[in-house]
Amino acid sequence: MPEPRRSTIDAGEVERFSALAAEWWNPNGKFRPLHKFNPVRLSYIRDQIAARFGRDPRAARPFEGLRILDIGCGGGLLCEPMARLGAEVVGADASETNIEVAKLHAAEGNVIVDYRATTAEDLADAGETFDVILNMEVVEHVADIDLFVAKCGQMVRPGGIMFVATINRTLKALGLAIIGAEYVLRWLPRGTHQFGKLVRPEELEKALGGASLTIIDRTGVTYNPLADRWARSKDMDVNYMVLAEKGSV
């Protein structure tokens, strides 16, 4: 009898985010923290892609000719800016509800994104490949991080790159990202993050290494409550982002 196929999908996580789908593009709604967080993510992604592929970030469509996957794209908060910068963008999410919201918003703004209700393993098994993969705030929500990273890594073309943003598994992160953000300030619905599923940088580096990806840049991201804004930082105790590269053949 064949073994059941391994999956990266955590059904509870998909259900949780599907229930919030209508809120994706409301900057003052349930995803307000993500809207606040988005500018620092976008600037990091834009600058690093431009540097790695020799593009001028000041050009009108600097990412023309690049194929980008946003895995776990939600409502498309990263897909649309990448498409406006000229990239061919595939936005994938396990939640069909999220994908429908993303499609509707893109159509309203006349932005072309190839949205698909699918998984990393299905895309990888279909032979899809990309110059850039955006893996942002997803690894802490999957059922099998090693399989997920392996399947994503399989889709990165030689010389291509993958961004990963997540939350460190530290007591500081427990206090700020879970207790503070979800239970005290109520920035996020309770249960959005589970402490045991948060990912330490060394764990992420090991998973990436197993997928033939090498970390070439990393940065912390911290919140300034006085300025009400996020910024890059050396402090990786809570939120952090890494950039990993697949070597050329």
From Swiss-Prot:
InterPro entries: SAM-dependent_MTases_sf, UbiG_MeTrfase. Keywords: Methyltransferase, S-adenosyl-L-methionine, Transferase, Ubiquinone biosynthesis. It catalyses: a 3-demethylubiquinol + S-adenosyl-L-methionine = a ubiquinol + S-adenosyl-L-homocysteine + H(+); a 3-(all-trans-polyprenyl)benzene-1,2-diol + S-adenosyl-L-methionine = a 2-methoxy-6-(all-trans-polyprenyl)phenol + S-adenosyl-L-homocysteine + H(+). SUPFAM superfamilies: S-adenosyl-L-methionine-dependent methyltransferases. The keyword Transferase applies. It comes from the Bacteria. Pfam families: Methyltransf_23. Belongs to the methyltransferase superfamily. UbiG/COQ3 family. This is Ubiquinone biosynthesis O-methyltransferase. The gene is ubiG.
